[in-house]
């Protein structure tokens, strides 16, 4: 039986116009999320505060999941890209407040510079039971 594919396109965050990707692609019960960064909606820039950036990032991920009637608990895999791995513990303090057990599989990956000067980029895969 062929899978049904529903492509969800949400305009690029921060008012940067139409970028050449979908914010998520839903295939059957699996939702593939693009990379999200934590831009301040008022300034369209990365906030000075690391904590605020993390919260904006996680809120963006949560809000995208809600568009297909999923929650953070539906995430099965998450990848976080970060040019400064010394922020690992600070990221974890806030990240953990968005989940209850069981937690998704996860990688925190040291990376090169991220777009718009972001400190973090997150992408994930969610599956609806």
Regions found by a protein language model. Give the residues of each.
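N-terminal presequence-like segments and the immediate start of the first folded domain
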Residues: 1-59, 63-76, 82-129
């Amino acid at each position: 039986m062929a899978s049904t594919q529903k492509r969800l396109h949400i305009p690029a965050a921060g008012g940067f116009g139409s970028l050449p990707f979908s914010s998520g692609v839903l295939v059957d019960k699996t939702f593939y999320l693009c990379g999200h960064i934590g831009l301040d909606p008022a300034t369209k820039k990365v906030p000075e505060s690391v904590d605020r950036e993390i919260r904006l990032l996680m809120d963006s991920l949560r809000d995208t999941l809600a568009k297909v009637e999923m929650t953070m608990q539906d995430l099965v895999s998450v990848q976080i890209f970060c040019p400064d791995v010394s922020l690992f513990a600070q990221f974890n303090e806030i990240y953990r407040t968005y989940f209850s057990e069981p937690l998704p599989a996860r990688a925190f990956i040291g990376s090169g510079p991220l777009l718009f000067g972001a400190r973090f980029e997150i992408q994930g895969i969610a599956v609806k039971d």
